[in-house]
Curated annotation (Swiss-Prot):
<keyword id="KW-0808">Transferase</keyword>
<comment type="function">
    <text>Component of the acetyl coenzyme A carboxylase (ACC) complex. First, biotin carboxylase catalyzes the carboxylation of biotin on its carrier protein (BCCP) and then the CO(2) group is transferred by the carboxyltransferase to acetyl-CoA to form malonyl-CoA.</text>
</comment>
<keyword id="KW-0444">Lipid biosynthesis</keyword>
<dbReference type="GO" id="GO:0003989">
    <property type="term" value="F:acetyl-CoA carboxylase activity"/>
</dbReference>
<dbReference type="InterPro" id="IPR001095">
    <property type="entry name" value="Acetyl_CoA_COase_a_su"/>
</dbReference>
<dbReference type="Pfam" id="PF03255">
    <property type="entry name" value="ACCA"/>
</dbReference>
<keyword id="KW-0963">Cytoplasm</keyword>
<comment type="similarity">
    <text>Belongs to the AccA family.</text>
</comment>
<keyword id="KW-0275">Fatty acid biosynthesis</keyword>
<keyword id="KW-0547">Nucleotide-binding</keyword>
<keyword id="KW-0276">Fatty acid metabolism</keyword>
<keyword id="KW-0067">ATP-binding</keyword>
<protein>
    <recommendedName>
        <fullName>Acetyl-coenzyme A carboxylase carboxyl transferase subunit alpha</fullName>
        <ecNumber>2.1.3.15</ecNumber>
    </recommendedName>
</protein>
<dbReference type="GO" id="GO:0016743">
    <property type="term" value="F:carboxyl- or carbamoyltransferase activity"/>
</dbReference>
<dbReference type="GO" id="GO:0005524">
    <property type="term" value="F:ATP binding"/>
</dbReference>
<dbReference type="GO" id="GO:2001295">
    <property type="term" value="P:malonyl-CoA biosynthetic process"/>
</dbReference>
<dbReference type="InterPro" id="IPR011763">
    <property type="entry name" value="COA_CT_C"/>
</dbReference>
Amino acid sequence: MANEMEFEKPILELKSKIADLKEYNETSDVDLTNEIEKLEKRLAKLEASVYSNMTAWDKFQVARHPERPTTLDYISLLFEDFMELHGDRAFGDDAAIVGGVATFNGIPVTVIGHQRGKDTKDNLHRNFGMPHPEGFRKALRLMKQADKFGRPIICFIDTKGAYPGRAAEERGQSEAIARNLYEMSDMKVPIISIVIGEGGSGGALALGVGNQIFMLENAVFSVISPEGAAAILWKDAGQAKKAAESMRITADDLFELGITDGIIPEVKGGAHRDLTAQAAEINKTITKSLHALMAFSEEQLMNQRYEKFKKIGVYEIL
């Protein structure tokens, strides 16, 4: 089956066997109902075992799944009256980042996120979700607009990282990212950031200075990809699985380290299995977070955000 992952093979093989038996059961005189029921019970146990014992590498594969829902997928289900806004008012429009104004349960908000493509043509248009400087500057323009008009900001993070090409560097890639971090830290409105897939390095951080940060259960957040880390540490990108297990990139890891504020449960097998159900889980988290943050004053929001990031990376020697 296309786009299925290595760790799911036992599940897929059993599902295929059940499907074959059901088809045979409908066309033959032999009653295989009992056998099918036994296999379905076995399948339920197998799925529970596999999906509750996923490794960091397994989750990394799910986070990169080609059919994983994107920012625009979630926007269509979570927000009303979304109006996309374009351009950074300096160089151009970057399709790797989408954003605009909308309402969330009647509350005017600004929503921004990385956008990967759905197929080869779309990925080329979206630059595989890797923003150029104009993408980050577009995001900042929308954030400043939200700050001016008192609209909460909701960011969806899903990128391998900022685009590392020559043109991007010439247009000030590092400055654009740094400027977002600087400006976001001083915004007077609630900022909620949600890692929905892959949170890669500075490209993710540029939308990640939130009052609260959440991750989907199978999302990852890291300074470098496992392949990149393996190439640096062991001179062998083939050691990516080993690197993933060492890097602490999963939602559980980031929550334990105090970097994120919560984990959003995923539907069994990953968000791509049921977009509507997954959007409903995200809706619950945004609703609860907005309710809490909108009770804060402007000064409290800025202080809370400052204190949150001030604590990250603090350690003590035992």
